[in-house]
């Protein structure tokens, strides 16, 4: 189970900290939250603006924009909304954890128990760093649970099976069934499916 109730309690409120467009990510996270009975608070990061800042070499502006988004997230987390679940990109998750650390707090201290996170930076190395340095260790040892996610408009959100140190923090995404089904066909006979394991 990729969103265990223990860490993503039904009825919990969520914070969505990441891009709302041009993709459907915000809608997917918001729907998941509402389907599970909670309210989703959204902080939008515009990836198109981020790309423009990077292309212009305006790294100071980029850092200010990131700080602006993090400050909004902190305001929501401080407002008593009992947020237990979070979606954030890896860079924003790290920035949020560091901002909380500067205040003498942590992601767990503000009540977050489960995190969806996804983005191009998501690697086994980053997952290990996040687990050990940002989330207080593995969830089985009292840390915050994190589910790596990958998605696109056609498929939707695919979650990884639980990521653990024993597997080298390997990330294995599973497409949402039955919406996304993968089939391998014989290139010489496109009407013929290839048997599993062939």
What are these regions (language model features)?
Residues 1-27, 31:
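Conserved adenylate-forming
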Residues 5-9, 34-39, 102:
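Alpha-helix capping at helix-to-loop junctions
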Residues 16-19, 35-36, 55:
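Intrinsically disordered, low-complexity segments enriched in small/polar residues
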Residues 26-42:
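Conserved short alpha-helical elements in the N-terminal third of ANL/AMP-binding
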Residues 39-198:
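Active-site glycine/GP-rich loop and adjacent strand/helix microenvironment
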């Amino acid at each position: 189970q990729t969103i265990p109730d223990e860490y993503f309690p039904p009825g919990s409120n969520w914070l969505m900290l990441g891009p709302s467009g041009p993709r459907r990510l915000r809608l997917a996270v918001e729907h998941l939250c509402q389907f599970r009975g909670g309210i989703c608070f959204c902080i939008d990061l515009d990836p198109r603006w981020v790309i423009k800042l990077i292309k212009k070499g305006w790294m100071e502006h980029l850092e200010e924009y990131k700080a602006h988004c993090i400050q909004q997230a902190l305001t929501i987390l401080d407002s008593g909304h009992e947020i237990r679940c979070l979606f954030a990109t890896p860079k924003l998750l790290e920035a949020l954890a560091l901002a909380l650390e500067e205040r003498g707090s942590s992601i767990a201290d503000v009540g977050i128990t489960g995190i969806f996170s996804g983005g191009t930076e998501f690697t086994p190395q980053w997952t290990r760093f996040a687990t050990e340095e940002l989330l207080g260790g593995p969830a089985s040892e009292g840390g915050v649970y994190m589910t790596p996610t990958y998605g696109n408009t056609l498929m939707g959100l695919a979650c990884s099976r639980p990521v653990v140190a024993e597997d080298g923090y390997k990330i294995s995404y599973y497409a949402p069934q039955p919406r996304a089904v993968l089939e391998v066909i014989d290139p010489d006979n496109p009407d013929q499916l290839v048997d599993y394991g062939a």
